[in-house]
């Protein structure tokens, strides 16, 4: 028996990392929002690694914060350790990574949601969508509750027809033995969505009290205070270490001897797994020439003995997992608390989405996170905030927000998904971004805070601080151009100390700073101080912008050329079959993806430069024909 559960502007289905960002974004933009989740105790749950950030992913977390999202602030309050990665490399690949207290992370995120004014959090299993006049108008739960809305965001993670597999044991389940969502997956197929079956996995957890840490290498956090959020002012200083150990010949022998019992090789697992996060049995087979593989031991929180055995993701039978653990230095006597497992789940083919993450088949329906074929909390959260923003903008009758590939890693992620699709769980990598020098950890606010303010996610007070920071950067760059550094004894002594060639003639301070060995801190020692003391963030930004000015300038020229192609819009209803000369494959792929611009069309798999030339001629002929009609 059904009943009317209420009317909302936006409904978010799921409260994982995509769902919480979607719900908070929509609510903070003024939309009356309902968030439905299978289990109130699993809000922002971390079923796999207890960490946030890393290469590319850490920059996404910064971007979420710059737009006005929550992940960065939450991990800053709940981490047990932070490290800046790739500090010996250029700024384009530097990224922050935090070990989370996964239980505190959940608690704090749930508290934030419960306290949000326009957001109602409720437990319930959504089984069907309400479709009226071809549009999504709400959801129906298994208890018969009908909730109506102007937009719905589905963020179901790995719960859609979830199946856990350990050895020859397989059963319907969401992650960590939670209830799966079965009927919603079938309903999406009924609506005509093309689905795929993906797989991911997780390693065993062991009791930290039973680890022999003397046989491992300690991995401490950075002593320098770190934070993801631009708003964080209080830093956690009592960090917990992680530890490093390795597999060995014995480990590899045990796994090789039991490959016949592995679901990966017995045919039990049908779903495609993540290329960049392989199981330990996959690593042993694919990289059989490697004598050992890294294993990181990561505490799951401050008030638990559970330790995550990172690098040992597996679906081998439980008895084999125990033998594998005993073969690893430091884990000989470790007690397993939870076995590793593989989980299969359904996802939609993401080329069925517009770049706003609204589905093409059903207007008013948005999807975000692992349902779109991605892996990782950060990728999910990045999609979540964009889906929430665009759902709220739809309710407001406004155009959606689409981030360009040159503006954000989130833009790269979404463009890759909706334009190219994915045949495996998609992981964001720095190599996927052609403009990665522009998409740095340090400048996410300069790229996106303006947009966050315009849509109503950034408060005026924060925006004013941001504007002041921009002004300070510009003023200091200009000041350095006006100051001359002369080849004095003091200057050349400094240069000798840092291993740089002596200065032979006077140069501008900004030119002096361009020397590879010279930092802003060095420059500050040999020139007058600015009227106002600069923050470390401003000084870092000044240094990077000056040092990489030439490279950045070249990349901006590339962006401008690409923009010309992106500015050439394509009608949504364009009949590609009517374009003479277009290759058959191009017609099929373009009809499926329905790119919104020539730039996007050029990135569709199977579309060649010759196809783009023909498309450009066709669009130009259409434009001229329209002009001719207007002048008649």
Swiss-Prot record:
Assembly description: Homodimer. Heterotetramer of two MnmE and two MnmG subunits.
GO process terms (BP): tRNA methylation; tRNA wobble uridine modification
Task of the protein: NAD-binding protein involved in the addition of a carboxymethylaminomethyl (cmnm) group at the wobble position (U34) of certain tRNAs, forming tRNA-cmnm(5)s(2)U34.
Organism: Halalkalibacterium halodurans (strain ATCC BAA-125 / DSM 18197 / FERM 7344 / JCM 9153 / C-125) (Bacillus halodurans)
Keyword NAD: yes
Keywords, in A-Z order: Cytoplasm, FAD, Flavoprotein, NAD, tRNA processing
Protein name (Swiss-Prot/TrEMBL): tRNA uridine 5-carboxymethylaminomethyl modification enzyme MnmG
Annotated localization: Cytoplasm
Annotated signal peptide: none
Keyword Isomerase: no
Pfam families named among the record's database cross-references: GIDA (PF01134), GIDA_C_1st (PF21680), SAM_GIDA_C (PF13932)
